[in-house]
UniProtKB/Swiss-Prot annotation:
Family the UniProt entry places it in: Belongs to the universal ribosomal protein uL3 family.
Record's keyword terms, sorted: Methylation, Ribonucleoprotein, Ribosomal protein, RNA-binding, rRNA-binding
Keyword Transcription regulation among record annotations: no
GO CC field: cytosolic large ribosomal subunit
Quaternary structure note: Part of the 50S ribosomal subunit. Forms a cluster with proteins L14 and L19.
Keyword Ribonucleoprotein: yes
Record's protein name: Large ribosomal subunit protein uL3
GO molecular function: rRNA binding; structural constituent of ribosome
Amino acid sequence: MRSGLIAQKVGMTRIFTEDGTHVPVTVLKVDTCQVVSTRSVEKDGYVAVQLGAGTAKVKNVSKPARANFAKAKVEPKKKLVEFRVAPENLLEVGTELSAAHFIPGQYVDVTGTTIGKGFAGGMKRWNFRGLEATHGVSVSHRSHGSTGQRQDPGKVFKGKKMAGHMGDEQVTTQNLTVVSTDADRGLILVKGSVPGHEGSWVLVRDAVKRKLPDGVPFPAGVKAAASAE
């Protein structure tokens, strides 16, 4: 199990294959993604790496966090995320990862926070059909109708689809294809859409339901190695 990457969603565009097929892609940017600290079985009971991405202003970082960054000899980071890894894939503190961590044709899982929609009704939130336009219905055309039974069970069951807050929740989109990568500019192009608005942070991991293809760098795609090639 390898580490993932922290990236920022730039936006969507499209590219054309050699046979002229148009492919919609989401552009993800990897910016100064470094290992800030590590976790070990002896000390923490599990193996993981803590990655940081983006450069934060020192005034916006707490004093304990500043001490951690200083100990790791890395710049203060805007986003910190921990990734579980296999012991043989543990990285040294200060290692900077690049977009070459993934290869074209590979499948990845992307986790992000969806765009918040506020309070939404049943038709928008759950795709309900609504009530009749006529036949005695008035005012309640877009309502979701009945919410339960009668005295027995005498309650609305938990999880009932009703109007409420929509969006602004963590979602993972699985099995997205990596169309291409640009290690020099730190760009990853994945086929299809990714949760979140432009500029939001997303986590990119190897797909859990797909086999890793040959040629994937182990333990990770390090920036120094990518630039040396």
